[in-house]
Structures are given as structure tokens and as C-alpha cells.
């Protein structure tokens, strides 16, 4: 199942008795406030992003539950040595403009090994993160087709009868990873996704409407790619 990685941003977190109690649900012995460092990940929201995708509100709520207990890695490397923090709570926060955002609260122990990471976070040097998951459905905003089952002719970012096409990412199939990463060198870095969400290949005669012949060919070429990988 294809993985989608979305950029997230680290924020300062306050530690109180209630938060410490949530942290201690993840530990083998009770930790004190002086033993832990906490931070927040301002992750996905329900707005259309630069990839012309948005998470549904129900999916954000699912993610808030599914990511609790997952480790926070370094540079997408899966090993015990790169596990530097853990998610202890998740929630969906609303703003006045109607935006709903997934916020993951994380902790790490204060040790000699984690001291450089904590210093990098506190100084603002290390503040980028990616959140990885697989979704059950990718629904076209124009026709409603689930791209995991069949390909429609609509392309994200193109306009159809005054409406810009985007994909609604709906339902959490799996929560894979959270990873602290370096600042991306390119604006589009940090995204891994299936070009057409693992759906069926389009029939040879199928073309998106309104596009020039060269654009149609590019669309078909992209549909044949299984993954696009722009790593940090």
C-alpha cells in the first residue's frame, strides 16, 4: 500500500501534570517533568495543500488516535538508534477560519544522547518533520471517483468548469511513521506518494479534457509511475 508523507512543523509545548500523566502511559516507570522534553507537531489540516490534496475532517480525527504511541524517527531511518521521541497524545484543533489541524504531542527523555537534538529543536535549527500514512480512499473533488479503485480523467490542480480539482484523502489505512528531518532544499521536498494512488491504469484512449496533446502525454506518463520520491 502506497505511503503518503506530509510535512509537519515542530512547535513549543507546555508540560503540566495532565500532560505528564499522558506521557507516563507510554513509559515503564513514571517520569518526572525534569526528565522529559516535549514538543508539538503541527501536522495535516483539512485545507487543500500545494499538492492539491486535503484530509477530510473524519480522517484527521482518525489520525489523532492512530499516531499515539508511534516513535519519532530521524531522517526516515527505521532502527532503534533513530527512535528519539514518541507521540503521547493527538488532537484536532480548530481555528476561527474553519481550518481543522492535526496536532501530535511528543516527548523524549532528557539524556546525553538527546541533548543535541533538544538543543537543535529549541534553537529552531531542527523544526521540520514528516508524517507518513496510507489512506483508504483518494476521492476526486470533481467527480468523486476513488483513485485507489479507478482512474478518472481529472488532474489535480487543473480547472474544470471553474472548479480546481483536488483529492480528498479519506480514511486511515495505516499510520507508518513520524520523522525529524533536515530543512528541505526544495519547496516540494518531503512528499512521497503514488502518482495516481495505486489505482488501475487508464484505458489507452482516455485523456483529460481541456489539456493540450503534450499535457495528455505527460499525464499518461505520470500515471504509469508507482511512486514519486522527493526525499529531504
Language-model features: locations:
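Signature of dsDNA virion morphogenesis modules
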Residues: 1-204, 215, 226, 232
